[in-house]
Regions:
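Basic, ligand-binding patches in group-transfer machinery
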Residues: 1-126, 151
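Active-site and donor-binding regions of nucleotide-sugar-utilizing enzymes
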Residues: 29-63, 69, 116, 122-276, ...
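Conserved catalytic-core segment of nucleotide-activated headgroup transferases in glycan assembly
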Residues: 135-150, 271-356, 429-431
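Donor nucleotide-activated moiety binding/catalytic core segment of transferases
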Residues: 176-190, 343, 348-390
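A donor-sugar binding/catalytic signature common to diverse glycosyltransferases
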Residues: 195-200, 214-218, 369-413
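A short, gly/pro- and small-residue-rich
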Residues: 205-224, 306-315, 397-408
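Catalytic binding pocket for nucleotide-activated donors in carbohydrate/polymer assembly enzymes
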Residues: 261-262, 355-361, 385-459
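C-terminal alpha-helical cap of glycosyltransferases
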Residues: 462-472
C-alpha cells in the first residue's frame, strides 16, 4: 500500500514457491516488485539457474498499477539442494507451504510424493464439454482421436439426459454420466482431463486437489477477447489453448492480469474449426441471431452447473431489447422482402426463458441442430459480445453486434474489457440501438455493407496440432 500511495520500495523481500510440476521436475517461484528495471540473479546449488519460462503479472488498483509479480519456472535436478534468489543484490527469503525454508529438501519430498501419486494414473484421457451438452471442442477432438489414434484410452463425460447422448453413443463414444460413482473412479484414474469448460464438478470431483497430479487441458469454449483473469486464475490449467496471436499475447504475455505463461499457453486454434471449414455452405439465406448470456441474470447454481430459473428475467433490459427486435414488424418485413430464414439460438442459459419472448412463428428457435451446422448454413450473424462471432470470421461471413447495454455488461460481469475493441477489431458494425441495427442489417441484405477482413490464420490440421500438445 505504501508503495502504491507514497512510491516507497517494498519492504518485505520474499520469494514464494507456488507450485510444483512433478511431471517435468519444475517449480514455480514468484516474488513481488515495483521497479520494472530491477536485476535478478537466481542460483541453484550456486550455479546460475536456467529459466524455462517467465512472466510479469500486473495488479491494478483504482485503474493504476498497484504492483508487479514475477513468475518464473525453474528446472530441478534430483540432487538439487539450494535455491538462492537475489533482487538488486539483496537475497530474498524463501517460503514454501507457508514456511520459511533454507534449502529444497521439503520441496523435493513433496515432488517425490506427487510423482508417486501421478504414477497411479492410467493412460486414460477424460473429455468433457458441458455436463449436459456436447457439440463443442471436446467432442470434435475426441472424434479425431477416436478415428486417428484408436489405441488411446478415452472416455467422454456427458449426462444420460443430454440430447446429445444417443447421438454420440451411436457414433461409438465411450460415455460416462457425471452423476455416477464410475465418473469419480475415472477421474481418479485418468492422466489427463480435456475440457472446453472449467466446471466445478470436474475440479472438485474428489476434493480441492482432484487435478493436482493430472494434466488439465483447457480447450476453451471460444476465443477470449475480454479479461477473464479473475475467473481463470482460480483454476489449475496445464495446457491452455488459444486461437489468435492477439489472444495468445493477451494471456501469455507480460503486464497483464493472467497468471499463465508460455509454459501453459499454446496457439493452435479451436478443435471444432477443422469441421467448421470443411462443412461450410455458401450462398445461403439464413440469419443467425445468437446473443450471449448475462451472468448477473442467472438463477442459483444447482448440481452439475445447472441454473435455476430467475423470476425477474423478463424485467431485464436484456430481455426487453432482444424481444423488441425479434418481435418487430420491420425485421419480419426484411426477412420476407429478401427471402431470409431467421434462427434465434441464444446462449443455452436462455433456453428456459424462450417461451417468455413470445416470438412470431416465422422465427425458428431450435437447439436440435448442432452449432456447427448453424454456423455453416447461415449467411450472417447478429450477436452482442459473444465470441461465436469468431466462427463466422473463420468462415468469412458478416457479423453485426447489438450492444445496447455496453456499460452495464462490463460493469456487472466477472471479467473486464480486454484487448479486443469491437469497433476496431470486430468483424462487422457495432449497433447501440434498435434503429441502427435494422439499418445495418438492411445494408447487408442489400449488399451495401463494407466487409471487414478477418485476420485469423487457420491451420489445416488443428485437432492434430492439439493432440500433439496433449501428448507432451
Amino acid at each position: 500500500i505504501l508503495n502504491y500511495f507514497k512510491n516507497e520500495d517494498l519492504s518485505e523481500n520474499i520469494a514464494f514457491i507456488e507450485s510444483i510440476d512433478d511431471k517435468n521436475d519444475e517449480i514455480l517461484i514468484k516474488y513481488y516488485f515495483n521497479d520494472v528495471n530491477h536485476k535478478t540473479k537466481i542460483l541453484l546449488d550456486n550455479e546460475v539457474a536456467i529459466i524455462k519460462h517467465s512472466k510479469i503479472r500486473q495488479y491494478d488498483l483504482l485503474d493504476k498499477v498497484f504492483l508487479y509479480e514475477k513468475r518464473i519456472w525453474l528446472k530441478l535436478k534430483n540432487d538439487t539442494k539450494t535455491l538462492d534468489i537475489f533482487i538488486n543484490s539483496q537475497k530474498l527469503k524463501l517460503v514454501f507451504n507457508d514456511r520459511c525454508i533454507n534449502d529444497l529438501s521439503l520441496v523435493l519430498k513433496v515432488l517425490a510424493k506427487q510423482k508417486k501419486q501421478r504414477s497411479k494414473n492410467s493412460n486414460l484421457w477424460l473429455f468433457a464439454d458441458m455436463s449436459w451438452r456436447a457439440d463443442d471442442n471436446a467432442e470434435h477432438l475426441y472424434r479425431y482421436i477416436m478415428q486417428n489414434h484408436p489405441k488411446q484410452k478415452t472416455a467422454f463425460i456427458l449426462s444420460k439426459n443430454s440430447t446429445d447422448y444417443l447421438r454420440l453413443k451411436k457414433e461409438g463414444f465411450r460415455l460416462v454420466d457425471p452423476k455416477g460413482f464410475y465418473f469419480k473412479y475415472l477421474i481418479y484414474k485418468a492422466d489427463k482431463i480435456i475440457s472446453s469448460h472449467i466446471d466445478k464438478y470436474i475440479f472438485n470431483a474428489l476434493g480441492g486437489d482432484t487435478l493436482k497430479t493430472k494434466d488439465f487441458i483447457f480447450l476453451q469454449h471460444g476465443v477470449i477477447k475480454d479479461d477473464l483473469s479473475r475467473w481463470l486464475n482460480q483454476r489449475k490449467i496445464d495446457t491452455f489453448i488459444t486461437s489468435t496471436k492477439a489472444e495468445y499475447e493477451s494471456i501469455a504475455g507480460d503486464f497483464n492480469h493472467y497468471k499463465f505463461s508460455t509454459k501453459e499457453v499454446v496457439l493452435t486454434g479451436l478443435a471444432r474449426w477443422d469441421a467448421l471449414i470443411k462443412n461450410n455452405v455458401l450462398n445461403t439465406k439464413q440469419i443467425l441471431i445468437m446473443p450471449t448470456w448475462r451472468e448477473y441474470l442467472s438463477g442459483k447454481v444447482q448440481k452439475y452447473g445447472v441454473r435455476a430459473r430467475n423470476s425477474e428475467f423478463v424485467k431485464s433490459l436484456y430481455f426487453q431489447k432482444w424481444q423488441e427486435f425479434l418481435c418487430s414488424k420491420e425485421l419480419e418485413k426484411l426477412a420476407v422482402r429478401y427471402g431470409y430464414n431467421i434462427i434465434f439460438t441464444p446462449h443455452p442459459q436462455v433456453k428456459i426463458y424462450l417461451e417468455d419472448f413470445n416470438l412470431p412463428s416465422y422465427i425458428i428457435t431450435s437447439y436440435k441442430e448442432s452449432m456447427q451446422e448453424l454456423f455453416c448454413k447461415s449467411s450472417l450473424m447478429i450477436t452482442d459480445y459473444s465470441s461465436v462471432a469468431f466462427e463466422m470470421a473463420v468462415l468469412k461471413k458478416p457479423v453485426l453486434y447489438y450492444q445496447f447495454d455496453k456499460d452495464e455488461f462490463f460493469a456487472k460481469h466477472s471479467y473486464a474489457k480486454g484487448y479486443f475493441d469491437y469497433e476496431k477489431d470486430g468483424f462487422g458494425e457495432v449497433c447501440f440501438n434498435y434503429e441502427q441495427l435494422l439499418f445495418c442489417l438492411k445494408n447487408i441484405l442489400n449488399h451495401n455493407d463494407k466487409k471487414k477482413d478477418s485476420c485469423i490464420l487457420i491451420s489445416q490440421n488443428i485437432c492434430k496440432d492439439i493432440f500433439k500438445k496433449c501428448k507432451l
